[in-house]
Structures are given as structure tokens and as C-alpha cells.
């Protein structure tokens, strides 16, 4: 799974707070044209999950569950009680269904300003790669530049970023990091994440 959009870090931080405050698990949904290819979430107007269906023939919504989950600490005990599926695997769907049965599962639906890219097949991985290439080529901005993210979040300072630039050397990536260091790129909160 790949996620790209404005404010992703804020969404993640808010989700941690939601789970801690409400003691409920949280999943995310993304509108798709072909929900039968995915796990589908149905919810009420308050974001409470009503149902989860895996690749339904007649989906109850167009929102696919995107594979990003937040759980309260009780998930440890929940996971210990999960039985292997018919495929002899412990399934995350079983964990989510356990929280659903207890009415402790909420969903946040990503809006149209956010992109979720499923990369579970060769074709979808190619589509995701082409998407990334197009964005980077058109904007000149890097997607998922770990040094940029670390710098903007305050995990490294300007001196450390400069040390990294010197280590990388004189190339396109190094030039991009110089622009970040010098404040030329000031696009805030556009993050990309692989999950």
C-alpha cells in the first residue's frame, strides 16, 4: 500500500489520539470504482463501522479498507485469541472483526485530495510507480524523501542535513536536498508512505 496526500502526518497523529481517547480500533477507507476487488467497509454518519466484507459480490459501499490500522493496547489480547484462517494464517481481518463485534471499530474515509495506491499486483505496482514518476517529474519534488521528512519533522537539524548532502555528493538527489536545506521547497505536509 502506498499513501500520498496533504496532511498525512496530521492524520496519523490524530488517529493515535482518537484510539487513545475512545479506546476503539481505527481503519481507513478510500473510495474506489470497483469495490468487489477489495475488503469493503460500511459505516454510519459518525464513522462507526457497520460491516466489513472481503471482496463482496454486492458491496455495501464503495470504500475499500486500505491496510492502515490503529489499535488500542487490548489488541494484544485480541490477537492472542485469533485462530488461523482456512489458509492457516492469522488474518488482520479477524482482528478487525473482533473489534467490530464489540462495536469498537471506527473508520476514517480519505477524501479526494488524498491518494491510496494498492500495489498488491504487478499491474498495480506499475501504476503506482508511474504515478510517483509523474508527480516527481511535473513538480520537481521528491516523494518519500526520508531526509526531507526527517528534517521537516525536526528529527535532524540543518547541520546533519548538510552532512548528508556532503556524503551523497554532487548528484540530482543531493541537489534536491540542498533546495530543502536552503528553504527553496516549502511545500508542507505532503507525505508519501509505503505500508
Task: State the predicted function of each range.
Residues 1-45, 70-73, 78-82:
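Conserved beta-loop-beta/alpha segment of the NTase-like Rossmann-fold superfamily
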Residues 3, 192-194:
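Aromatic (phenylalanine/tyrosine) cluster motif
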Residues 6, 36-39, 116-120, 153:
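Short, solvent-exposed polar/charged micro-motifs at secondary-structure junctions
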Residues 9-10, 121, 195:
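N-terminal glycine-rich phosphate-binding loop and ensuing alpha1 helix
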Residues 16-19, 48-148, 159-160:
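Catalytic-core segments of class I nucleotidyltransferases/pyrophosphorylases
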Residues 155-156, 161-187:
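Short, amphipathic C-terminal "tail helix"
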Amino acid at each position: 500500500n502506498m499513501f500520498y496526500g496533504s496532511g498525512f502526518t496530521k492524520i496519523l497523529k490524530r488517529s493515535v489520539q482518537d484510539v487513545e481517547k475512545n479506546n476503539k480500533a481505527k481503519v481507513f477507507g478510500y473510495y474506489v470504482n470497483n469495490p468487489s476487488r477489495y475488503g469493503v467497509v460500511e459505516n454510519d454518519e459518525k464513522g462507526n463501522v457497520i460491516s466489513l466484507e472481503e471482496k463482496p459480490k454486492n458491496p455495501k459501499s464503495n470504500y475499500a479498507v486500505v491496510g492502515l490500522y490503529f489499535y488500542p493496547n487490548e489488541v494484544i489480547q485480541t490477537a492472542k485469541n485469533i485462530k488461523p484462517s482456512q489458509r492457516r494464517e492469522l488474518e488482520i481481518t479477524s482482528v478487525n472483526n473482533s473489534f467490530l463485534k464489540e462495536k469498537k471499530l471506527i473508520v476514517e474515509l480519505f477524501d479526494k485530495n488524498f491518494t491510496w495506491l494498492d500495489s498488491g499486483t504487478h499491474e498495480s505496482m506499475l501504476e503506482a510507480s508511474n504515478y510517483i514518476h509523474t508527480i516527481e517529474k511535473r513538480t520537481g519534488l521528491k516523494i518519500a524523501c526520508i531526509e526531507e521528512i526527517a528534517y521537516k519533522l525536526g528529527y535532524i537539524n540543518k547541520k546533519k542535513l548538510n552532512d548528508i548532502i556532503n556524503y551523497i555528493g554532487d548528484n540530482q538527489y543531493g541537489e534536491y536536498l540542498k533546495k530543502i536545506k536552503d528553504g527553496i521547497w516549502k511545500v508542507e505536509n505532503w507525505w508519501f508512505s509505503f505500508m
